From Swiss-Prot:
One of its GO terms (biological process) is keto-3-deoxy-D-manno-octulosonic acid biosynthetic process. It comes from Cupriavidus pinatubonensis (strain JMP 134 / LMG 1197) (Cupriavidus necator (strain JMP 134)). The keyword Calcium does not apply. Keywords: Cytoplasm, Lipopolysaccharide biosynthesis, Transferase. Its EC number is 2.5.1.55. This is 2-dehydro-3-deoxyphosphooctonate aldolase. Pathway: Carbohydrate biosynthesis; 3-deoxy-D-manno-octulosonate biosynthesis; 3-deoxy-D-manno-octulosonate from D-ribulose 5-phosphate: step 2/3; Bacterial outer membrane biogenesis; lipopolysaccharide biosynthesis. One of its GO terms (cellular component) is cytoplasm. Gene3D superfamilies: Aldolase class I. The keyword Amino-acid biosynthesis does not apply. It is found in: Cytoplasm. Signal peptide: none annotated.
Length: 289
């Protein structure tokens, strides 16, 4: 699959989707995107900038949601133009798709909406690549149905059907907790779509602070190493210059100052993993046949 001018897949270096959870200001967006571009450029990692204009599923109705679609898209367009990087943002309603697709390079669907057929079909018919997040309630093999819906919709519209990604972001484990089953990354390869691992939402503690979600950012390096060692096409990671002051998802965001050292480790591990190959491709039962 070709994405934003670069090839993605298990035979290619992983690409990175990264940025603050929500757009807080134009200057912060420009500064963060510029820093990430410099880091990924030095490390040779393909990069897509991510930030949201609206967080429609906050734990509390009193929490900051964002700057709104009009202002948010203006800022994303500025980042794209001035920093020279492709941009991604998420949409939450069918009516948002057309104006957002006119600005960004990649669309992203919220995990909660992965089973909404009309929504997935509309996103697939936007003409843009779509990063489709797996719901916290969904088995990994069920993502094949979701990807198939998107492909069918694209073909119905006469559009390419190989522009969709399947993204793992953890699965609910009791109340206010998520776990990451690394088997899901291998299982989701059966969709035929590039698999992306969301390393920061996977350490989220949904609603864990009562009116907001908590998180355990100290486990981002742990899970991201595990995912890269399993084998992924892409890595999603939210970052912030000062996570403790972030207006959304600070507890699970990676400090921007730590991104370079983490990505350097992951780049080297990714190269080793892909050079060694994937034994699981022909490791099924019976093992001694």
């Amino acid at each position: 699959m070709k994405l934003c001018g670069f090839e993605v897949g298990l035979d290619k270096p992983f690409f990175l989707i990264a940025g603050p959870c929500v757009i807080e200001s134009e200057q912060m967006a420009l500064d963060t995107a510029g820093e990430l571009k410099a880091i990924t450029g030095e490390l040779g990692i393909p990069f897509i900038y991510k930030s949201s204009f609206d967080k429609a599923n906050r734990s509390s109705g009193k929490s900051f949601r964002g700057l709104g679609m009009e202002k948010g898209l203006e800022i994303l367009a500025t980042v794209k133009r001035e920093i020279g990087v492709p941009v991604l943002t998420d949409i939450h309603e069918i009516d948002e798709i057309k104006p957002v697709a006119a600005v960004v390079d990649v669309l992203q669907t919220p995990a909660f909406l992965c089973r909404q057929t009309d929504f997935i079909r509309a996103c697939a018919q936007s003409g843009k690549p779509v990063n489709i997040k797996k719901g916290q309630f969904l088995a990994p093999h069920d993502m094949k149905n979701v990807i198939d819906k998107a492909r069918d919709a694209a073909r119905d519209a006469g559009l390419p059907d190989d522009v969709f990604m399947a993204c793992e972001r953890g699965v609910s484990f009791g109340y206010n907790n998520l776990v990451s089953d690394m088997r899901s990354l291998a299982i989701m390869r059966e969709t035929g779509a590039p698999v992306v691992f969301d390393a920061t939402h996977s350490v989220q503690l949904p609603g864990g602070q009562g009116t907001s979600s908590g998180g355990q950012r100290e486990f981002v390096p742990v899970l991201s190493r595990a995912a890269v060692a399993t084998g992924i096409a892409g890595l999603f990671m939210e970052t912030h210059p000062d996570p403790n002051k972030a207006m959304s998802d600070g507890p699970n965001a990676v400090p921007l100052s730590r991104m370079k050292e983490l990505l350097a480790v992951l780049r080297d591990l990714d190269a080793l993993t892909k050079r060694a190959g994937f034994l699981e491709d022909n490791f099924g039962w019976p093992a001694c046949a």
